[in-house]
Amino acid sequence: MPWNSEHTNWFFKIETNLKSKDGKEVCLLEYNYDLNDKTVLSKWAKHFRNHYCFDSEIDFLRNGTGLSRKDFLVQLKFPTEARGFGSGIRSGDFSEILVADYLEYILGYWVPRTRYGNKTIRDESTKGTDLIGFKLYDENKTTKDVLKMFEVKAQYSGNKAKPRLQDAIDDSIKDDLRKAESLNAIKQRLFDKGKTEEALKVARFQNQVDMPYTSEFGVAALYSNDIYDEDVIINCDTSAHPYNSALFLIVIKGDDMMKLVHKLFEIAADES
């Protein structure tokens, strides 16, 4: 399998009393990556690349294009580095994948990886809920099952921090309405990939009346350290969220995050 979790060892939780304006606790994490650790970066790049195109499929998909594996990824699959909205899409995709890895490998949810491989336009973000994670407890479809919908926002450049956590909170308000479409999209993509067993796991969550489970919500904001501003975080407000009591807030910050984003795309292409 292409998936790898060693890069999640670079997460460090910062003990803090950080709270939103309405008293909601905020989990603060530092992401202390190491660009000199070639082994971890290589494994991570493979993990990252396979979100866009499985290594087992790349030769078939590039057939007829006249492109090498690297050029196929750079010219047709990966968001562009500098053109138009490409850089912003790169940072958004990276941030969603990083939070998905935290959700799966640190918090113990199953997060299907279906969001990026079927993009029609590579410099656009995929519509729908950013992330959905699942906890399935047994074959009897017990009410212990959990579905967690996550919205992710990032800012890695600029002179002043924007209210990205508030933006994620506001987007999360719509997630319950988008749930049915998002679940159907995940299930269909898994089925199209021949992953019928995983598609059936998603089906367990498509009718909450007949198969009860717990719904949870999460929001994440990611910043580079040079623009991170605690005042922007503590001024966010979750009181308008209809599922406020089931809302998890997380902030991830690290040094020069956009440098890491571009480096990861570079390694993913070079080692394809």
Where are each of the predicted segments found?
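Nuclease-adjacent, charged terminal/linker segments that flank catalytic cores
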Residues: 1-70, 77, 265-272
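Charged, often glycine-rich, active-site loop that binds/positions anionic groups
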Residues: 73-76, 82, 123-133
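A short, highly charged nucleic-acid-interacting micro-segment common to nuclease
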Residues: 78-100, 120-122
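Conserved catalytic cores of phosphodiester-cleaving nucleases, focusing on short active-site segments
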Residues: 103, 131-133, 148-154
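A short acidic/basic microdomain associated with nuclease active sites
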Residues: 106-124
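Short, solvent-exposed loop/turn segments that connect beta-strands within catalytic domains
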Residues: 137-145
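Acidic, metal/cofactor-coordinating or nucleic-acid-engaging core segments within structured domains
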Residues: 158-228
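Charged, structured surface patches that assemble and position nucleic-acid processing machinery
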Residues: 201-272
